[in-house]
A protein has these predicted regions:
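Transmembrane-helix boundary motif in ABC transporter permease subunits
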Residues: 1-8
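Generic hydrophobic transmembrane alpha-helix motif, especially the helices
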Residues: 8-45, 52-53
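Functionally critical, cavity-lining and gating residues within the transmembrane helices
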Residues: 16, 20, 45, 63, ...
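Transmembrane alpha-helices
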Residues: 36-40, 72-105, 152
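Short cytoplasmic-facing helical segments at TM-TM junctions of multi-pass membrane proteins
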Residues: 49-88, 120
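C-terminal transmembrane helix and the adjacent membrane-cytosol boundary/short C-terminal tail
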Residues: 55, 135-169
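Non-cytoplasmic
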Residues: 91-146, 150
């Protein structure tokens, strides 16, 4: 069913600029807060893709597992997750790109002395004088996101083989 989907969607509707300061208050200014902010931006595509993949399992397959008396765990790990893997990897690709945004946004409320977020703030404040820095950060973020996405695609290709090329769904 749809169980947690409305809560996941509602949580994603809260802007990251509203969530980040609250996380700083709760978790401090360390790596855990940065990871939490990146996670906040990445859980949504993975959760939705996984849910859709599991919902797409054919009824006949579920009936077969039910007929042979498979436990809920066997159905989950033997049928649902393997069937959903192509969509899970699509969600992970999207999340990989969002993780770069999350990591950069996570640097903004901390007053961090270095990082891409600091360069963005500095370039924005002095845009007339340093536009090249802003462009370099944009290029670095794009490159990092592309590397992450290609990494996920490589894992998907080696994990799923032909299924990662769209032959399942």
């Amino acid at each position: 069913g749809y169980g947690l989907t409305p809560l996941v969607v509602a949580a994603q509707a809260v802007p990251i600029v509203a969530v980040a300061p609250a996380l700083v208050l709760w978790l401090g200014t360390g790596a855990a807060t940065k990871a939490a902010i990146a996670t906040y931006l990445t859980y949504f595509p993975v959760t939705i893709a996984t849910t859709r993949g599991i919902q797409a399992v054919p009824a006949e397959s579920r009936e077969l597992f039910h007929t042979i008396g498979a436990s809920k765990r066997t159905v989950l790990f033997g049928l649902e997750i393997p069937f959903a893997l192509p969509l899970i990897f699509v969600g992970l690709e999207t999340a990989a790109a969002f993780s770069v945004v999350g990591a950069i946004v996570a640097e903004l409320p901390f007053g961090s002395p270095d990082g891409l977020g600091v360069v963005i703030l500095t370039s924005w404040q002095f845009y007339i004088f340093q536009p090249e820095s802003l462009y370099c950060v944009a290029l670095a973020a794009c490159s990092l996101g592309a590397v992450f996405v290609l990494g996920i695609r490589s894992i998907a290709y080696f994990s799923l083989g032909a299924r990662s090329q769209g032959e399942v769904l």
